[in-house]
């Protein structure tokens, strides 16, 4: 509002989104009054930091109870795992990583499902254009699926996290969907729950 005949106090605001690219920004303000007298100030700058961050859901990956020893190429019943880019830095291909652990039997702890029996992909097994073949290798040496290694971070092939508005929920704008396959259940293990309780959670991160 007007302070006097020659001075006015003007307030404004500018929205900054979490996906705006980091760097130096200039603040430019100009004002023209009713008599076309004009003034401006372009001397102020600010720096928006670059932030690498993700949010992952769901927190639990589950399989149907009818999975038995010898079963092959089983897909999760609550996929995909959604990885949201909540920062403003693009994650390039293969730099979304997963660290898996062997799944230990909750009753008989000497029995386990090896982490290497799982594979992951950014396409699911219902993809009809194959190759690529989705998260299950199905006996095919697919270069697109990524096999897990116990306790070691593995970059997921073709996984890209663009910078964008992930709330669009379209699987591409600031978002990646990944699908996990249990390629085979070892013969000779008993029917029981196998989980991460003993060796720790699986971790999805970015490099």
Question: Where do the language-model regions lie?
Answer:
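Signature of Gram-negative chaperone-usher
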Residues: 17-19, 41-207
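Long, low-complexity serine/threonine/glycine- and acidic-rich segments characteristic of extracellular
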Residues: 1-42
């Amino acid at each position: 509002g007007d302070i006097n005949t020659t001075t006015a106090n003007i307030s404004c605001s500018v929205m900054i989104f979490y996906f705006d690219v980091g760097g130096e920004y200039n603040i430019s303000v100009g004002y023209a009054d009713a008599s076309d007298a004009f003034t401006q100030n372009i001397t102020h700058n600010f720096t928006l930091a670059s932030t690498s961050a993700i949010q992952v859901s769901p927190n639990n990956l589950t399989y149907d109870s009818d999975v038995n020893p010898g079963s092959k190429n089983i897909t999760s019943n609550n996929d995909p795992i959604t990885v949201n880019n909540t920062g403003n830095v693009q994650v390039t291909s293969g730099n979304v990583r997963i660290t898996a652990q062997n799944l230990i039997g909750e009753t008989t702890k000497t029995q386990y499902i090896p982490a290497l029996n799982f594979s992951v992909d950014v396409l699911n097994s219902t993809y009809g254009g194959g190759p690529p073949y989705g998260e299950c290798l199905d006996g095919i040496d697919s270069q697109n699926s990524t096999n897990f290694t116990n306790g070691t971070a593995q970059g997921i092939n073709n996984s890209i996290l663009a910078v964008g508005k992930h709330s669009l929920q379209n699987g591409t704008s600031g978002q990646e969907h990944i699908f996990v396959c249990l390629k085979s259940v070892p013969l000779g293990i008993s029917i029981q729950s196998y989980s991460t309780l003993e060796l720790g959670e699986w971790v999805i991160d970015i490099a």
